């Protein structure tokens, strides 16, 4: 039974996912269906959390839109994600950056990792 589940998961896992960590600024291009139309929508922000659970892996991206914080959780191996682009590497010392929810302006900035 376990080998069957493992085999199915192996087929579903995407291979073209770039390596990114918490604190990185990424752009996620997602397919959006509106009525009968299908288009690509871009969501760019800072990765504040990553949950690695094989096929059930997910990551949370936060951005500020019109002065309001917007967070979106993406399933890493979802078919709705077209591509993930890493724009900037962030230098952080924590895995979960939930403290950014309470910060605004310059206090919410993250230093850039140079390597």
UniProtKB/Swiss-Prot annotation:
Keywords: Ribonucleoprotein, Ribosomal protein. GO terms for cellular component: cytosolic large ribosomal subunit. GO terms for biological process: translation. The keyword Ribosomal protein applies. Pfam families: Ribosomal_L19 (PF01245). One of its GO terms (molecular function) is structural constituent of ribosome. InterPro entries: Ribosomal_bL19, Ribosomal_bL19_CS, Ribosomal_bL19_sf, Translation_prot_SH3-like_sf. Belongs to the bacterial ribosomal protein bL19 family. HAMAP family: Ribosomal_bL19 (MF_00402). This protein is located at the 30S-50S ribosomal subunit interface and may play a role in the structure and function of the aminoacyl-tRNA binding site. This is Large ribosomal subunit protein bL19. The lineage of its organism: Bacteria, Pseudomonadati, Pseudomonadota, Gammaproteobacteria, Enterobacterales.
């Amino acid at each position: 039974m376990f080998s069957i589940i493992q085999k199915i998961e192996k087929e579903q896992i995407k291979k073209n996912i770039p390596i990114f960590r918490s604190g990185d600024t990424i752009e996620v291009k997602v397919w959006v269906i509106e009525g009968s139309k299908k288009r690509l929508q871009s969501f760019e922000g800072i990765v504040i959390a990553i949950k690695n659970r094989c096929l059930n892996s997910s990551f949370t991206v936060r951005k500020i839109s019109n002065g309001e914080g917007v967070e979106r959780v993406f399933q890493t191996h979802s078919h709705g994600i077209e591509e993930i682009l890493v724009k900037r590497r962030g230098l952080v010392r924590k895995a979960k950056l939930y403290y950014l929810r309470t910060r605004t302006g310059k206090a919410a900035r993250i230093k850039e990792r140079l390597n």
